[in-house]
From Swiss-Prot:
Disulfide bonds: none annotated. Pfam families: Ribosomal_S4, S4. Belongs to the universal ribosomal protein uS4 family. CDD domains: S4 (cd00165). Part of the 30S ribosomal subunit. Contacts protein S5. The interaction surface between S4 and S5 is involved in control of translational fidelity. This is Small ribosomal subunit protein uS4. The gene is rpsD. It comes from Paramagnetospirillum magneticum (strain ATCC 700264 / AMB-1) (Magnetospirillum magneticum). The lineage of its organism: Bacteria, Pseudomonadati, Pseudomonadota, Alphaproteobacteria, Rhodospirillales. InterPro entries: Ribosomal_uS4 (IPR022801), Ribosomal_uS4_bac-type (IPR005709), Ribosomal_uS4_CS (IPR018079), Ribosomal_uS4_N (IPR001912), S4_RNA-bd (IPR002942), S4_RNA-bd_sf (IPR036986). One of the primary rRNA binding proteins, it binds directly to 16S rRNA where it nucleates assembly of the body of the 30S subunit. Residues 20-47 are annotated as: Disordered. The keyword Ribonucleoprotein applies.
Amino acid sequence: MSKRIEAKYKINRRLGANLWGRSKSPLNRGKENPPGQHGQRRKKPSDFGTQLMAKQKLKGYYGNISEKQFRRLYDEAVRRRGDTSENLIGLLECRLDAVVYRLKFAPTPFAARQLVNHCHILVNGKRVNIPSYRVNEGDVISVKTKSKDMALILEAAQSGERDVPDYMEVDHKEMKGKFVRIPKLGDVPYAVQMEPNLVVEFYSR
């Protein structure tokens, strides 16, 4: 298991935000200080600090993806027509692991990544084991037949913690879903406020 997955709830504590809105988050148990810090006082962040925090929240939300992958997506967002921050959100939501999470085939982005890595997920009927794979509008995402009875998948599908967004369609009986359209920032059901505009400011310094 990677260090990124082992530390998923440490991300919540470090950023002071319950990124995925989960009841298991340490923030729901009063552990609000970053790991290793015991004092209650926090300095007001500088503009740089605020921008950095916005970037870390967005990276952390999508499974603490690497800086290299995140920067590559940002650079592509810049090259595309339209608003860079909206483009960035759209590209993040097109990642296969993000789509698997949104369809409620997994309880967290980390678990979604593991399902993809371990070949439990199909795209248009073909096995794909690359979490960063770019899903296109109209693509059908499904759980492999032999994996449909996995407890982790069934529990995620039945969970009432979150809903499937309207830019996707899903049939949990068949464990199959469709990526209908690329969302805008306002469409994405983040549990906390995301500020991709500050991410743009961070990289534009």
